[in-house]
């Protein structure tokens, strides 16, 4: 996968050189390029200006962004604009983006963008109902969530399939050695070696956590008969 990031602050992306994303780059699975669109700004490198019609704040001018985009070595990229008014990012969206060969991120700053910038864009994405100072943190979040889903990045294909949201449910609790720590014990079923019971316990825990914390995820979830039965048992406990 090739990723190009248009930003005023390329140094902010240093964390992407570490951990999973950094390893993907080292393996040659991923290429990331950073482009400071101030370098292509006319008018003494000014990238912003006052909005027509008046209003608070400054808007990013279209010219520096367009000229930077025109210089990218891309064919048919998915072009992502980070915007609080965009479609909310989630795990399903990350899985969708992980299928792409080329991604371009446009990171805003100041009050917003000249609307004409959006003619370059295929996707407007938001992390949620809040506003960040710029799009850089949002872009890093999306890159990390997406890159880890690329085959060969995590090593084991199944290693992300049990993550929260990958299955449509929140992840079940997990434990490692020792079996008891400061009086807190690992559930007996996980020490039993009985794989059927362990699988059912994990299913029950995942459903319980989702029901208690994110019941909205269950609205469109495709239940198996066993899962539906377990969920009904969980619901009946509170009656």
From Swiss-Prot:
Organism field: Streptococcus thermophilus (strain CNRZ 1066)
Any one GO CC term of the record: cytosol
Family: Belongs to the RNA methyltransferase TrmD family.
Keywords annotated in UniProt: Cytoplasm, Methyltransferase, S-adenosyl-L-methionine, Transferase, tRNA processing
Protein's cellular compartments: Cytoplasm
Residues annotated for S-adenosyl-L-methionine binding in this entry: 108, 127-132
Any one GO MF annotation of this record: tRNA (guanine(37)-N1)-methyltransferase activity
Gene: trmD
InterPro entries on file: Alpha/beta_knot_MTases (IPR029028), tRNA_m1G_MeTrfase_C_sf (IPR023148), tRNA_m1G_MeTrfase_TrmD (IPR002649), tRNA_m1G_MTases_N (IPR029026), tRNA_MeTrfase_TRMD/TRM10 (IPR016009)
Disulphide bond pairs: none
EC number: 2.1.1.228
Pfam families: tRNA_m1G_MT
Catalytic reactions on record: guanosine(37) in tRNA + S-adenosyl-L-methionine = N(1)-methylguanosine(37) in tRNA + S-adenosyl-L-homocysteine + H(+)
The keyword Methyltransferase belongs to this UniProt entry's keyword annotation: yes
Enzyme class, broadest EC rank: transferase
Subunit text: Homodimer.
UniProt xrefs under Gene3D superfamilies: 3.40.1280.10, tRNA(m1g37)methyltransferase, domain 2
Main subcellular location: cytoplasm
GO terms of biological process kind: tRNA N1-guanine methylation
The protein's name: tRNA (guanine-N(1)-)-methyltransferase
Function according to Swiss-Prot or TrEMBL: Specifically methylates guanosine-37 in various tRNAs.
């Amino acid at each position: 996968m090739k990723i190009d990031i248009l930003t005023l602050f390329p140094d902010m992306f240093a964390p992407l050189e570490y951990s999973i994303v950094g390893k993907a780059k080292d393996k040659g699975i991923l290429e990331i390029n950073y482009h400071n669109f101030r370098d292509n700004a006319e008018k003494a490198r000014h990238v912003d200006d006052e909005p027509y019609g008046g209003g608070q704040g400054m808007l990013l001018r279209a010219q520096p962004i367009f000229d930077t985009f025109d210089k990218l070595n891309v064919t048919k990229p998915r072009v992502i604009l980070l915007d609080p008014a965009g479609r909310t990012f989630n795990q399903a969206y990350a899985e969708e983006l992980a299928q792409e060969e080329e991604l371009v991120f446009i990171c805003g700053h100041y009050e917003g963008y000249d609307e004409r910038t959006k003619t370059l864009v295929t996707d407007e994405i938001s992390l949620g109902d809040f506003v960040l100072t710029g799009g850089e943190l949002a872009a890093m979040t999306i890159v990390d969530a997406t890159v880890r889903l690329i085959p060969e990045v995590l090593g084991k294909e199944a290693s992300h399939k049990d993550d929260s949201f990958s299955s449509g449910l929140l992840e079940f609790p997990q434990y490692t050695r020792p079996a008891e720590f400061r009086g807190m014990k690992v559930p007996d079923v996980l020490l039993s070696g009985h794989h059927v019971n362990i699988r059912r316990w994990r299913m029950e825990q995942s459903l319980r956590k989702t029901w208690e914390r994110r019941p909205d995820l269950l609205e469109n979830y495709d239940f198996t008969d066993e899962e539906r039965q377990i969920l009904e048992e969980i619901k009946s406990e509170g009656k």
